[in-house]
Amino acid sequence: MGKVIGIDLGTTFSCVAVMEGGQPVVIPNAEGARTTPSVVAFTKEGERLVGQVAKRQAIVNPDRTIMSIKRHMGTDYKVKIDDKEYTPQEISAMILQKLKADAEAYLGEKVTQAVITVPAYFNDSQRQATKDAGRIAGLEVLRIINEPTAAALAYGLDKEGNQKIMVYDLGGGTFDVSILEIGDGVFEVLATSGNNHLGGDDFDQRIIDWLADNFKKEYGIDLRNDRMALQRLKDAAEKAKIELSSATVTNINLPFITADATGPKHIDVNLTRAKFEELISDLVESTVGPVNQALSDAGLKPSDIDKVILIGGSTRVPLVQETVKRIMGKEPHKGINPDEAVAIGAAIQAAVLAGEVKDILLLDVTPLSLGIETLGGVFTKIIERNTTIPTRKSQIFTTAADNQTSVEIHVLQGERPMAKDNKTLGRFILSGIPPAPRGVPQIEVTFDIDANGIVHVSAKDLGTGKSQDITITSTTNLSEEEIQRMINEAKQYEEQDRKKKEEIEIRNKADSLIYQAEKTMKDLGDKMTQAEKDEINREIENVRKALEGSDIEAIKNASEKLSQAFYKVSTRIYQQAGGQTGGATNTGSAGQGTTQDNVYEANYKVEDDDNK
């Protein structure tokens, strides 16, 4: 069995790790970095870019660059590039393909299985979409685990004794808080809460709006209507936010941001940490509610928590750290890398599933209550939030009208009392119920949540034994046909990427060959005949012409001819040198250099040694 990798598929950055020699190791990407921007771009020529190279060109190509796609997982959102529409699953799969390829290059073997993390507060549709993205990328997703739980694994792997910990996870696009009890290899989630639309992107947006509003006041131009200017604002906002984690003031300088009839316009302003904190204070304060909710659900007080673990890049913001300290009454633990902990935890869980790591038991929970719509549009819960998974629960319902022969089961997820205010996961119909007065038929509805947090629902008429069993597939999930089509397209992209890489390597080799040929001709000088020089120059020119075109076979053929021409010249020169030095072997001559003195000296030394 090959290695199972752990992947943190983040809103702004992603990370991949693996267990090696009993220790989790973060895998660097092809560019040498330990995290990869969750950015995908398409050039006007149709080439696909993923990661740092995609992020780098975003300013000049904003319309064809896709960022923070994770925020749209589990929705019917589509990205249109040229005439093609891409789902969030497809874009996420491109990021996963890049991580998979980097892992394969690092490990030197094919990777086909992974554990992928999701925010603890992700609903069923979002979890299913993440699993589909893995399949499209060519990965068998062995387990979907919650990000705070993964971080707790990373923290607690080498800890002894029982501890109650809180994981406060504020990333680029999502916020989670989970409370766990850990000890003796058991990681039990007691409660979880969060907000799927709160993170560093929102902090950036506050800076963007502040810059754009001030610019509009001064010049009457709204930079948010100019895609290229807006992308420059986004980049500047992100940099300013990062700098203000260590500095108290930062300068935002964007020359030639736009122009009007009066000439070019520039931005050159200072943003203080105090002003930044004023801009984001309500966002940071909104994390307090979920923290208190999780504590309440777990039946704990802040003083009962032994350690508070900060995860996610946004927890580097000083105001966030101060807020956590204020509500918990203790300094947060900073002995864990907030960017890498989730991927490390995923790698640990991957090793557990692969049988490499023993004596670890992970008991996670469902973040939201599950149930069905009943008479009057009421949401009737069958499984309460924070129930340990996997779990299975049943409840008996009956018909609402006389002689009702079918019932529609409307499956929902959420905490609101009315069905319409919760998230619809799906609907299905149980038919064939014998006509009877209302209240007589008995219909057993069973909810089954697997270890991935993905829901399966069945309904059974206890009178006839007739049942209907489905895995929830809401309207935003992909059909099997769509997934297969996307898998095939992903393979095509992989093939295109492979060919592109091969083309670059062939071109680089050809360039290198020209350089070596010209250098060697210069070094050999008059040892080459004029005819040989003409032939080599002719072949060099042929390679140069081939490089100007797009025919890779032509470049390979021209390079091969140049190599052959040089081989002929080299062979003649070395044979000639060998003949003039008493018939020394070609190998010996070549090994000692090209001058007669060197060759003669080598042979002389060998004879001297033999005589001894």
UniProtKB/Swiss-Prot annotation:
Domain of life of the organism encoding this protein: Bacteria
This protein's record includes keyword ATP-binding: yes
Region of interest called Disordered, as start-end residue ranges on this chain: 578-612
Record's keyword terms, sorted: ATP-binding, Chaperone, Nucleotide-binding, Phosphoprotein, Stress response
Upregulation: By stress conditions e.g. heat shock.
Compositionally biased residues, Low complexity: 578-596
Entry-annotated residues carrying Phosphothreonine: 174
Tagged with keyword Nuclease: no
SUPFAM superfamilies: Actin-like ATPase domain, Heat shock protein 70kD (HSP70), C-terminal subdomain, Heat shock protein 70kD (HSP70), peptide-binding domain
InterPro entries in the record: ATPase_NBD, Chaperone_DnaK, Heat_shock_70_CS, HSP70_C_sf, HSP70_peptide-bd_sf, Hsp_70_fam
Example GO molecular function: unfolded protein binding
NCBIfam families: PRK00290.1, prok_dnaK
PANTHER family reported for this sequence: HEAT SHOCK PROTEIN 70KDA
Family: Belongs to the heat shock protein 70 family.
Function summary: Acts as a chaperone.
Protein's UniProt name: Chaperone protein DnaK
Gene: dnaK
